[in-house]
């Protein structure tokens, strides 16, 4: 039986629980995961450093493209076993189950939050019920097919340019960050950043406890770097994180609308896990970095609301009310007392947002809920009883 949710639904309030980081983990250059939080922060968390004098040198964000160490598409999808390993490690250290209704990746919640202003983008997710919680993941099979189809239908020259645009984002991250605080880095290390081989294997992932309305969420999201320092004595690290982005320099009124859409998505992904600062590098068509702007996440809704483009105005509060309503609906409609799996989809053609129970789900469940995680939760409940 299909259950549908009206797209015009809105929650009365937008009470978002203040995100709090529970733990972090990382993926290294070899694609291996590291779960020791202290080691992860010391060795896998970068620091932002890009003075105006460096920007004035017109950095080429396309340099080194031919040497790009890119992770294969099929390996660069949200890794649920890695997330569950992190959850398991955290629960073992506290001796208690994390109190969340939904466990998922920030990127998937970003898609749901921004849906009112991205009605042309399809959504295909799986919801696996286990131990009274909803584990939401991407439908990787459909996602990979969609990417392959898009590549097949695109002009090869345009496809190559899109790859270079993608690369320029990783290059910007490489030239604007340091592996240690500025004072601990040699002049040579700072000045040779432009020569560094760029990769998208390395990731630092923050896992935060948050929520909207009465629904409690655990979200895992990649963090690009720190603005300043790691606070001592276990104080909140989230205000120190930074999101890095690149975009084309704005030279015509029509480009403003495109940038506002991009800024809205960046606001959503930063807001969801409590990142308060966003740095945009603006490049020209030749991938030369022209200027850098710093935005405070909390100010973006006001900027978007004050836009002169009335027909394309994005209201973040409207998106939040949708998000609150749809997350509550998902949480209420999917029974948590039976270990089943569901398909959660948005179809742009029919404009329908729906969930349907999956009958043949054993392979899916086993690919998400690992044996180690099951054994841990069983042993945890035994000690509790």
UniProtKB/Swiss-Prot annotation:
Determine if Ribonucleoprotein is one of this entry's keywords: no
Kindly list the cofactors needed.
Answer: a divalent metal cation
- Which cellular component terms (GO) are annotated to the entry? Las1 complex; RNA polymerase II termination complex
- Main localisation: nucleus
GO MF entries: enzyme regulator activity; metal ion binding; mRNA 5'-diphosphatase activity; nucleotide binding; phosphodiesterase decapping endonuclease activity; RNA binding; RNA NAD+-cap (NAD+-forming) hydrolase activity
The entry's substrate-binding residues are 222, 245, 269
Keywords, A to Z, come to: Hydrolase, Metal-binding, mRNA processing, Nuclease, Nucleotide-binding, Nucleus, RNA-binding
Cofactor binding description: Divalent metal cation.
User: Binding positions for a divalent metal cation?
Assistant: 173, 224, 243-244
Q: What is its EC number?
A: 3.6.1.-
Where does the protein end up? Nucleus
According to its UniProt entry, the protein's GO biological process terms are: cleavage in ITS2 between 5.8S rRNA and LSU-rRNA of tricistronic rRNA transcript (SSU-rRNA, 5.8S rRNA, LSU-rRNA); deadenylation-independent decapping of nuclear-transcribed mRNA; mRNA processing; NAD-cap decapping; nuclear polyadenylation-dependent rRNA catabolic process; positive regulation of termination of RNA polymerase II transcription; termination of RNA polymerase II transcription, poly(A)-coupled
Pfam families per the UniProt record, alphabetical: RAI1
Give the family per the record: Belongs to the DXO/Dom3Z family.
Give the protein's biological function: Decapping enzyme for NAD-capped RNAs: specifically hydrolyzes the nicotinamide adenine dinucleotide (NAD) cap from a subset of RNAs by removing the entire NAD moiety from the 5'-end of an NAD-capped RNA. The NAD-cap is present at the 5'-end of some RNAs and snoRNAs. In contrast to the canonical 5'-end N7 methylguanosine (m7G) cap, the NAD cap promotes mRNA decay. Also acts as a non-canonical decapping enzyme that removes the entire cap structure of m7G capped or incompletely capped RNAs.
How does this chain assemble?
Interacts with RAT1; the interaction is direct, stabilizes RAT1 protein structure and stimulates its exoribonuclease activity. The interaction also stimulates RAI1 pyrophosphohydrolase activity, probably by recruiting it to mRNA substrates.
Q: Which PANTHER family match?
A: DECAPPING AND EXORIBONUCLEASE PROTEIN, DOM-3 RELATED
Record's protein name: Decapping nuclease RAI1
Protein species of origin: Debaryomyces hansenii (strain ATCC 36239 / CBS 767 / BCRC 21394 / JCM 1990 / NBRC 0083 / IGC 2968) (Yeast)
Which gene underlies this protein?
RAI1
């Amino acid at each position: 039986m299909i259950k549908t949710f009206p797209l015009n639904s809105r929650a009365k309030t937008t009470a978002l629980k203040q995100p709090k980081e529970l733990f972090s983990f990382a993926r290294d250059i070899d694609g291996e995961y590291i779960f020791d939080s202290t080691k992860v922060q010391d060795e896998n968390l970068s620091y932002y450093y890009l003075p105006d004098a460096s920007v004035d040198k017109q950095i080429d964000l396309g340099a080194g493209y031919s040497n790009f160490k890119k992770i294969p598409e099929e390996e660069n999808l949200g890794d649920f076993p890695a997330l569950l390993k992190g959850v398991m490690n955290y629960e073992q250290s506290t001796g208690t189950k994390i109190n969340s209704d939904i466990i998922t990746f920030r990127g998937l919640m970003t898609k749901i939050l921004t849906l009112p202003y991205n009605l042309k983008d399809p959504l295909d997710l799986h919801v696996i019920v286990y131990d009274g919680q909803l584990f939401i993941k991407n439908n990787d099979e459909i996602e990979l097919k969609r990417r392959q189809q898009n590549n097949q239908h695109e002009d090869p020259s345009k496809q190559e340019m899109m790859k270079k645009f993608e690369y320029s984002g990783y290059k910007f991250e490489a030239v604007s960050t340091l592996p240690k605080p500025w004072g601990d880095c040699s002049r040579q290390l700072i000045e040779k950043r432009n020569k560094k081989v760029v990769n998208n294997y390395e990731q630092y992932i923050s896992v935060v406890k948050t929520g909207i309305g009465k629904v409690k969420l655990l979200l895992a999201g990649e963090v690009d770097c720190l603005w300043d320092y790691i606070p001592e004595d276990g104080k909140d690290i989230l205000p120190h994180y930074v999101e890095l982005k690149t975009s084309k320099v704005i030279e015509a009124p029509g480009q403003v609308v495109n940038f506002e859409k991009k800024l809205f998505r960046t606001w959503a992904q930063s807001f969801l896990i409590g990142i308060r600062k966003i740095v945009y590098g603006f490049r020209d068509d030749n991938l030369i970095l022209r200027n850098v702007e710093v935005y405070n996440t909390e100010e973006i809704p006001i900027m978007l609301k004050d836009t002169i483009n009335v027909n394309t105005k994005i209201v973040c509060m409207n998106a939040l009310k949708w998000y609150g309503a749809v997350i509550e609906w998902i949480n209420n409609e999917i029974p948590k007392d039976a270990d089943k799996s569901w398909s959660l989809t948005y179809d742009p053609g029919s404009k329908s947002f729906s969930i349907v129970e999956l009958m043949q789900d054993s392979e899916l469940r086993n690919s998400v809920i690992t044996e180690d995680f099951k054994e841990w939760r069983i042993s945890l409940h035994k000690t509790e009883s």
